[in-house]
Amino acid sequence: MHLSITHAVTAQEKEELLTGLRAYNAQFLDLSTFSGDIGVYVRDDIGTMLGGLIGVRKGDWLNIDFLWVSDAVRGSGVGSQLIKTAEDEARRKGCKHALVDTASFQARPFYEKQGYQLQMSLQDYPYPGMQRHYLAKREFR
């Protein structure tokens, strides 16, 4: 047995590791419900992206991985539309709940306004004085 360290993980190494992990997890989970990205985007008339959301279905949950809204339209309701549209699509795909994490300098109040409730906060992440907040929305409608 040999132990190695790398700072340049290859696609092959990552896939080999994930194949083993998925095989183990398949004993406990229906992995067919752990697939399918959900992307929702807003663009202007010439195609420039003004905002977007990327999430993934994991069982009964929509995991929101990324949400961004351009300064040009921030505060106009675009973010709320992105969340609502993603939740509607996730529900159509079988999801019942949603999970998101956000940094203290990002969007916790926005998510709470959308009905998400704080589950926990990790202090001093990624740096001292900052937090990473985990929020969930149960039984979204």
Regions found by a protein language model. Name each.
Residues 99-101, 117-134:
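Conserved catalytic-core motifs of GNAT/GCN5-like acyltransferases
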Residues 17, 111-112, 116:
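Conserved active-site tyrosine of GNAT-family acetyltransferases
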Residues 67-74:
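A short, internal acetyl-CoA/4′-phosphopantetheine-binding micro-motif in the GNAT/acyltransferase core
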Residues 31-32, 44-46, 53-62, 67:
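A conserved beta-strand-loop-helix scaffold within acyl/acetyltransferase catalytic domains
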Residues 37-41, 52, 66, 132:
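Short hydrophobic/aromatic beta-strand element in the GNAT-like acyltransferase core
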Residues 1-9, 137, 141:
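Conserved N-terminal entry element of GNAT/NAT acetyltransferase domains
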Residues 90-103:
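Conserved GNAT acetyl-CoA-binding A-motif
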Residues 75-88, 113:
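Conserved acetyl-CoA-binding loop-helix of GNAT-fold acetyltransferases
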